[in-house]
């Protein structure tokens, strides 16, 4: 494993997104197995772990923070623990055809969230505290002011925003410097490349979630793939039979590049972004130790600037299906 900087925070070049251990991909994973997986990640040199207060199971809506905190307790002094605040779910909105994600960044809510997360994680500080989604009702400057206070109090060391626009970034950073922005990013979802110039100018890192487009880019799925009950991929556009046909050229390109580099398709999907910018850190999730090792190995794959440019040119040219992306939030 090698390491890079998000702002002035040093993390492993590949992190571990932990949401899928508790939710969204069928039944929750076995807790003992996931604790062992997280320990294995530490042994592989992964130091960057991502969770959130709202990642949970039907029995415990905050399960993921408890799981991750317990697993990392023996390693706490050598890992970077990231969690998130600022949303809750209102499932009744689904009946109205709306997103169930409701942003809430009122200062009192933020303070309650940080204290609850510290308790669930079993730690005295959070290394990186993200605003999970921008709240249009609360000015960015007000949220940043609360973050500055939490840093002074020692409850958090760094802060960031997830799914942020350039305006959000500039306004927040002017009050309390951001360490990272976490947005959806993959070969199939590149719209956030437009904020790279401002990140470079301000010295902010970029954390890429869903770097495999929820698994499509690993090449492990085809038009016959079926998903378990409760697996959100069953409803994602990129997994339909028509989409798989539409994405055939992209998957062929990945297999070709993988063969040339002695790698896997998934490793190429990660190496592409790692070699594109030195401040990009992907956080793929997994429940499997073999996939974890494969993802960690992507940090050692070298693509030249010419390789990356050639891949980008191909991505710009080729047909590609719709991909599950940012959802509209309740205003």
Predicted regions and their residues:
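Active-site groove signature of glycoside hydrolases
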Residues: 118-136
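Structural motif
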Residues: 40, 44, 120-121, 154, ...
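Beta/alpha (TIM)-barrel catalytic core signal, keyed to glycine-rich beta->alpha loops juxtaposed to Asp/Glu
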Residues: 134-323, 327-331
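Aromatic/hydrophobic pocket-lining residues that form the small-molecule binding cavity
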Residues: 34, 38, 110, 114, ...
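N-terminal binding-site loop/beta-alpha segment at the start of enzyme catalytic domains
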Residues: 1-80, 316, 320, 331
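Structural preference for beta-strand elements that scaffold enzyme active sites
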Residues: 11-15, 47-48, 78-84, 125-128, ...
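Active-site mouth loops of central-metabolism enzymes
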Residues: 20-32, 96-111
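Structural motif corresponding to the early beta-alpha repeats
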Residues: 77-103
């Amino acid at each position: 494993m090698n390491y890079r900087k998000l702002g002035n925070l040093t993390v492993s070049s590949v992190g571990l997104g932990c949401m899928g251990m508790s939710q969204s991909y069928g039944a929750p994973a076995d807790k003992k197995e996931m604790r062992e997986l997280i320990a294995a990640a530490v042994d592989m040199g992964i130091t960057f772990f991502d969770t959130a207060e709202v990642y949970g199971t039907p029995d415990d809506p905050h399960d993921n923070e408890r799981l991750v905190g317990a697993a990392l307790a023996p390693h706490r002094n050598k890992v970077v623990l990231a969690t998130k605040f600022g949303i809750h779910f209102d499932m009744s909105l689904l009946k109205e055809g709306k997103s169930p994600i409701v942003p809430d960044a009122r200062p009192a809510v933020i303070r309650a969230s940080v204290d609850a997360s510290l308790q669930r994680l079993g730690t005295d500080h959070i290394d990186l505290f993200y605003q999970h989604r921008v709240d249009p009702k609360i000015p960015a400057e007000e949220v940043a002011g609360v973050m500055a206070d939490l840093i002074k109090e020692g409850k958090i060391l760094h802060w960031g925003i997830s799914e942020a626009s350039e305006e959000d970034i500039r306004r927040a950073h002017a009050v309390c410097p951001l360490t990272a922005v976490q947005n959806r990013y993959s070969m199939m979802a590149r719209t956030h490349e437009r904020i790279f110039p401002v990140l470079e100018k301000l010295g902010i890192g970029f954390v890429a979630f869903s770097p495999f487009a929820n698994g499509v880019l690993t090449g492990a799925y085809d038009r016959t793939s079926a998903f378990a009950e409760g697996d959100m991929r069953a409803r994602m556009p990129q997994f339909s039979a028509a989409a798989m046909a539409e994405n055939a050229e992209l998957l062929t390109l990945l297999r070709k590049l993988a063969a040339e580099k002695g790698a896997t398709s998934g490793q190429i999907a990660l190496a592409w972004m790692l070699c594109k910018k030195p401040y990009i850190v992907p956080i793929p999730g997994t429940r499997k130790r073999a996939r974890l090792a494969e993802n960690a190995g992507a940090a050692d794959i070298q693509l030249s600037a010419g390789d990356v440019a050639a891949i980008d040119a191909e991505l710009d040219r080729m047909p590609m299906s719709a991909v599950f992306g940012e959802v509209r939030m309740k205003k």
